[in-house]
């Protein structure tokens, strides 16, 4: 997995993710769970967010590799997720978004 461009990732987040997710420390849940503190967190574990059983039971920890695979096709990676996002097919886009998320969700 190649390093991504944070600026391009920020633009992808703004256009593809921000309507449902926040990255700020006190951003809170929207349609989707808050993403602050994402790295090292288990699927289905954000307090106050109503996950599907599929998300709660997946049991993986979010990191560069799991996000890279998930962001390509969320419904394939976690069948039963309620995330409506179709995914990012281009590896470069996924790398850019992951670079932004890694930087902005600390």
Swiss-Prot record:
Chain positions found as N6,N6,N6-trimethyllysine: 75
Keywords: Electron transport, Heme, Iron, Metal-binding, Methylation, Mitochondrion, Respiratory chain, Transport
Main localization, broad class: mitochondrion
Keyword Nucleotide-binding included in the entry's annotation: no
Subcellular location: Mitochondrion intermembrane space
InterPro entries attached to this UniProt entry: Cyt_c-like_dom, Cyt_c-like_dom_sf, Cyt_c_1A/1B
UniProt KW Transport keyword: yes
GO molecular-function term, one example from the UniProt record: metal ion binding
Residues reported in the UniProt entry to bind heme c: 17, 20-21, 83
Posttranslational modification: Binds 1 heme c group covalently per subunit.
GO cellular component labels: mitochondrial intermembrane space
Superkingdom: Eukaryota
Role noted for this protein: Electron carrier protein. The oxidized form of the cytochrome c heme group can accept an electron from the heme group of the cytochrome c1 subunit of cytochrome reductase. Cytochrome c then transfers this electron to the cytochrome oxidase complex, the final protein carrier in the mitochondrial electron-transport chain.
Family per record: Belongs to the cytochrome c family.
Name of this chain's protein: Cytochrome c
Species of provenance: Gibberella zeae (strain ATCC MYA-4620 / CBS 123657 / FGSC 9075 / NRRL 31084 / PH-1)
Gene: CYC1
